[in-house]
Amino acid sequence: MQTWQLPEHIADVLPTNARQLESAREQLLALFRVHGYELVQPPLMEYAHSLLTHIDAGLSLKTILVTDRLSGRQLGIRADITPQVARIDAHLLSANQGINRLCYAGPVLHAQPDGLPNMREPLQAGAEMYGFADIRGDIELIDLMLKSMKIADMGKVLLSLGHIGIFRALSDAAHLDAGQSAALLALMQDKDTGSVEAQVKAWKLDGMWAKAFSLLPRLYGGREVLSDARGRLPDLSAVGGALDELQAVCDAFPDNEIHIDLSELRVDNYHTGLLYAAYAADFHDAVARGGRYDGLGGYFGRARPATGFSFDLRSFIGRLPAVERQPAVLVDAEDAEAAREAVEALREQGQCVVIDYGIGHNVSEELAGRLKKTDGVWQVVKR
């Protein structure tokens, strides 16, 4: 094995792309900040029992576990920042009984690649709101998600909506047990309409519920899906409430192309209600995902309404605007000591100054000039 080789699906980010990522990260955090979202930086590693909440069993498959040499306890390297932020809201920011708006941008590590582009070290960025159950909170986060996609230069973005509350309301009304609900949810996620129909038939569900479950995978399309669903799904208050929330989101974004899919349930297990995602050209999957996950903080002692979104900033590298390196001022090595004061003054002004040792360098070919002493004064002389 070569000493320079990296693990599979792990990659370095070289200067050109690193500049793109850091520029986009700075712009995103600035965007979040002017919308009232405070930056938090959870640790890369925590005790495993804190990272692996019982709510999302699938997270354990993504999480790399190690033994802490100090305590002997099991540690986990985070695979998702959202549970960490829920812990912060529930425990460290518990003095605030009102709304907490929080954001983050940091690396996570996956035990296995999670879809394309097959990277195991995403740079997860996102924003979350805790303490507000109203649909207006979800609309605020969706608006912020769409603005984030503009910074990432995604071009025209399709907003996709779903609501897991509809499926769960039907499951409860049909008296499905946890195992049946999970099995049917998996079939819904696979869009396997035939298997859904066969499964509800095998369970001998009441005709109304069997028809409703078979109908869900067919309820997709534009905004008209909502009126169609109202006329064809059982008249349950929870179903009606979920459709009202979806309608409110559609009304809030009249100029956006919207796709609604009532069987789109590809969510982390902690999501509880409205689901939203952004799709862009040339990407095989959603470029950002979010939704409501009320109660996740209960695992850490304070269950609160919550909604938020996240995305992998590294997956956008091919679309991010180029960020040119600042032209440098060169100073000859033999002049460096004498010119130290002038060099530091330029650097304090934000100017890149590089000592030229005469053997080449990796600075931009477009130099700002060379620092020379003219008439007793150090000046930048253009080439």
UniProtKB/Swiss-Prot annotation:
Belongs to the class-II aminoacyl-tRNA synthetase family. HisZ subfamily. It is found in: Cytoplasm. Pfam families: tRNA-synt_His. The keyword Amino-acid biosynthesis applies. This function is generally fulfilled by the C-terminal part of HisG, which is missing in some bacteria such as this one. Keywords: Amino-acid biosynthesis, Cytoplasm, Histidine biosynthesis. It comes from the Bacteria. GO terms for molecular function: histidine-tRNA ligase activity. This is ATP phosphoribosyltransferase regulatory subunit. The gene is hisZ. Pathway: Amino-acid biosynthesis; L-histidine biosynthesis; L-histidine from 5-phospho-alpha-D-ribose 1-diphosphate: step 1/9. Heteromultimer composed of HisG and HisZ subunits. PANTHER family: HISTIDINE--TRNA LIGASE, MITOCHONDRIAL-RELATED, HISTIDYL-TRNA SYNTHETASE. It comes from Neisseria gonorrhoeae (strain ATCC 700825 / FA 1090).
